[in-house]
Amino acid sequence: MGLAAARNKQRFGLDPRNTTWSNNTSRFGHKHLEKLGWKPGSGLGLVPDSTTSHIKVSIKDDNLGLGAKLKKKEKQDEFDSGECTGLDVFQRLLGRLNGNEQTISDELDKQRTDNIINGKWGIHFVKGEVLASTWDAENKQLISYSMGKKRPVEGSSDSEVSDRKKTKKVKKEKKVKKVKKEKKEKKEKKDKKEKKVKKEKKEKKEKKLKDKHSKDTNEITRDQMLKPRDSAAVVPDAVSTRLSVRAKWIRQKRAAVMDAKALNEIFMVTD
């Protein structure tokens, strides 16, 4: 392996300097600006010696975020090392070799003090206490918002203090009333629920007793089954038909059923 650095692949567009667009004088924007008094080589806006170069298109070939390269270009001086650790020691060494040790040391100490005041470990904190501006343009001084609402002004009158106390008292009374009302509603709701549960239990119990009573009344005992019915005691008159023999046999059978003693003998029941 050699000592050559790693190769970085570069990508260029078809027209990296955007000369095709800048040299094209037939486009609408070029003609319109010339009608308004603009000439090629002059700047735009109120200042004539402003930027005269055209827009150049560049391809993003890295994984850096948007604005990273601009931040790198915004270095205040040669000592602005950003977040690179250990570079201040190297700069002190270079300053000692070049004879500017005191100047570089003062500059680095100043940067370290600013970093301690403005941020911590590369994090810069922004005070977000209020959204209003803290600078009074008319009086040309900073506006202090600390404890402005909690402590009363020294020159406040007794009427303002009494009004404030009265307002606090009214708020407190409203709060107490609200709490009492909520407690009362909660208690009423609980009582209503308990009454409903008791009523449901009572109805359930009554229904159960009613079902039990109806079951007892509908139950047929053996004595009731053996007891002859009233309809069996009524024997219809004999009908003179061709089925008189069968009718006679049916009457005899009914007569046997009517006799309780005969039924006991049939079912082998002893008193």
UniProtKB/Swiss-Prot annotation:
Spell out the residue ranges making up region: Disordered.
Answer: 1-26, 149-233
Q: Its GO biological process terms?
A: rRNA processing
* Keywords recorded for this protein, A-Z: Nucleus, Ribosome biogenesis, rRNA processing
- Domain of life the protein comes from: Eukaryota
Q: Which InterPro entries match?
A: G_patch_dom, PINX1
Residue span, G-patch domain: 25-71
Task: Supply one GO CC term from the record.
Answer: nucleolus
Into which family does the record put it?
A: Belongs to the PINX1 family.
* Name assigned to this protein: Protein PXR1
